[in-house]
Amino acid sequence: MLLIHGLSSIAGTWWRIGPALAARGWDVSAVDQAGHGGRPVRGEVDAAGLAAAVLAVHPEAPDVLIGHSLGTVAAIGLLEREPGWAGAVILEEPPSRLAPELCLGMAESITADAVTVREDRAGLVARIRRDQPHWADEDVYWAVEGIAEMDPAPFARRLRVLAEEDSVGTPERIVAAEPTPYVLAASSERPLLDGGSALSRADRAELAHRLPAGHLLELDGGHCLHRDAPAAWLAAVAAVLS
């Protein structure tokens, strides 16, 4: 089983999930993506580039591939590069095509956080604790550490490109993937930049219509479901893989 983290995160985000899955009998690996955890960025940070970076450190095809947020982009890139590369695929909070102003806002946010974590780490810790009161201390630690170990520049550039690009929609790429992915989506009504879901209502409805029954699962929580609702996340994944 291979776990791929999201933007501004690192493999440590799976601190609870990885051991819990291992206790259920899975051989679990988690990778740091390009531009995260001290790894360099070579080329673009689009789906193809992210997939190539994953293969550089984990060339073995997994029985199960799980990605969160940016990790779902990498996962889709892996399946577009080699259909059927994984036995089963679970996408936690795959991001919809974002409005231009949201892309630009995220570019500014990740750049500002990279400065804040160097200049006022304690302040950033306090902000995340305030914004995410239900997170475990370890979740807060790894969230901050992920920001500290990220190179925001290539991702900010990519977000600015996406603000002007008319790319293929998320549902189209998910439905075309082989094997057909399972999607875990947050039920939160909050905006994405406030911790809400990255999957739009329109894309969610399209996926519900086009995916096989049982392939779209909604969980109570925000964008980081494996932090917000770890027990429900594990139960959903166990049900999918049983």
Identify the function of each model-found stretch:
Residues 29-66, 235:
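Active-site loop/oxyanion-hole signature of alpha/beta-hydrolase fold enzymes
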Residues 8, 32-37, 72, 96, ...:
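Alpha/beta-hydrolase active-site loop signature
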Residues 218-230, 234:
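Catalytic histidine-centered segment of alpha/beta-hydrolase-like enzymes
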Residues 67-71, 75:
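Gly/Ala-rich beta-loop-alpha elbow adjacent to hydrolase catalytic centers
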